Amino acid sequence: MNIKKYYILIAEGVTDCSLLEAVLEQYLQFSSFAKVDELPEIFKNMIGIYPSGLGELKRTDSPMFYYKDVIGIAVKQANGCNNLAAKASALIEIIDQLDVYDQFGGFLLFGETEDEIKTLLTRTFKERDFDYTGDVIKAYGHELTCKLHLLPSSGRGAIEKVLLKCVEKSYDTLTKDAENFKMVVMQPEYADIRKKCWAKKDEIQEFYADKVQFEAISAVLKPDRPVRFAIKDKIIRKEYYDLYMQIPDFKKVYDFLVENLKCVEE
């Protein structure tokens, strides 16, 4: 397999990553690598391991790996907005060790819409002696492309806001019933549960309410399975492509990937 360009997509959580993976698979015709032996060296170095040297049994996370023609892609979970720059910084070390700067196409970072995210990225990279300005990271005498996409693209919220727009078009009745359920659990009778299980602040409870609605939909579409399976198996499907392209935030994600993953259309 002759991979000439590598890209690394880093998103905040499993839901974000699942959406990106599904778009790559369903709408951009990328295939996932099936075996470790098939992976390019840079991707092999990103595979999670059990940190036995520390006496721990918790395995570090592994990305999903994809290819199409001469393009190789890793999709990695950051586990929170605060970790986007930290994950990218750790991967820069791998790029530097293998000296694959010429083959590296860049980082694509995906975060929730927050006013402070760009400042946070700049500060975290600087703590690691990397200079992040605009769409570029300066590291070890090299300039690496690093572009940020926010989901949703305006206002406050999480990736679930975009996904709820999708299921409104593909599963309308289910979405309405799930919204009714959300309204029920936002009533005063559930205030104690929300404070104990979600958050104490009302604005954060509103943030989690979208997640509850989407997870209710997911539980119907893929019972007894994590949310990622509903996204990849039931929501992001080829037959819904035209419907989803009518959703501005979804189309922006699609366009951002096409624009920045060079050779996708070649």
What is each stretch, according to the model?
Residues I8-E12, K76-Q77, D102-E116:
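Acidic beta-strand-to-loop metal/phosphate-binding motif
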Residues M1-E93, T124-E127:
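Domain-level signal for Mg2+-assisted phosphodiester chemistry and nucleotide/NA-binding surfaces
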Residues G105-G106, F110-K222, P226:
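Activity-critical C-terminal alpha-helical subdomain
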Residues M1, I94-D102, I137:
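Surface-exposed acidic, glycine-flexible loop patches that form ligand/cofactor-binding
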Residues Y7-T15, T113, L151, G155, ...:
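Conserved aromatic-histidine-acidic binding/catalytic patches
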Residues D233-E266:
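Charge-dense, extended regions
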